[in-house]
Amino acid sequence: MMLEHVLVLSAYLFSVGLYGLITSRNMVRALMCLELILNAVNINFVTFSDFFDSRQLKGAIFSIFVIAIAAAEAAIGLAIVSSIYRNRKSIRINQSNLLNK
């Protein structure tokens, strides 16, 4: 696969994730869009690592670290969303201003 094809795929994933993050009113959907953005970044890390120096695995190793951090971020984010839903009975972003109460 050529470099341009992978970069176009990554840019498409990033732009879909960014659009979803900006327009989403649901917290779970916003977390999913954030994961799309992080996966697009991981694709770029692996692609550039393979394209510029295929003998070293720096991009793949860094991508594994980003995946681990993204998994922790998703777990913490879903725990926060679950807690907000338990208290407010809503997971809409515009209804969860926690500074009011």
UniProtKB/Swiss-Prot annotation:
The keyword Transferase does not apply. The keyword Oxidoreductase does not apply. The chain crosses the membrane at residues 2-22, 32-52, 61-81. It is found in: Plastid, Chloroplast thylakoid membrane. It is a multi-pass membrane protein. It comes from the Eukaryota. GO terms for cellular component: chloroplast thylakoid membrane; NADH dehydrogenase complex. Gene3D superfamilies: 1.10.287.3510. Keywords: Chloroplast, Membrane, NAD, NADP, Plastid, Plastoquinone, Quinone, Thylakoid, Translocase, Transmembrane, Transmembrane helix, Transport. One of its GO terms (biological process) is ATP synthesis coupled electron transport. It is an enzyme of class 7 (translocase). It catalyses: a plastoquinone + NADH + (n+1) H(+)(in) = a plastoquinol + NAD(+) + n H(+)(out); a plastoquinone + NADPH + (n+1) H(+)(in) = a plastoquinol + NADP(+) + n H(+)(out). One of its GO terms (molecular function) is quinone binding. Its EC number is 7.1.1.-. PANTHER family: NADH-UBIQUINONE OXIDOREDUCTASE CHAIN 4L, NADH-UBIQUINONE OXIDOREDUCTASE SUBUNIT ND4L. Belongs to the complex I subunit 4L family. NDH shuttles electrons from NAD(P)H:plastoquinone, via FMN and iron-sulfur (Fe-S) centers, to quinones in the photosynthetic chain and possibly in a chloroplast respiratory chain. The immediate electron acceptor for the enzyme in this species is believed to be plastoquinone. Couples the redox reaction to proton translocation, and thus conserves the redox energy in a proton gradient. NDH is composed of at least 16 different subunits, 5 of which are encoded in the nucleus. NCBIfam families: PRK05715.1-2 (NF004320), PRK05715.1-4 (NF004322), PRK05715.1-5 (NF004323). This is NAD(P)H-quinone oxidoreductase subunit 4L, chloroplastic. It comes from Panax ginseng.
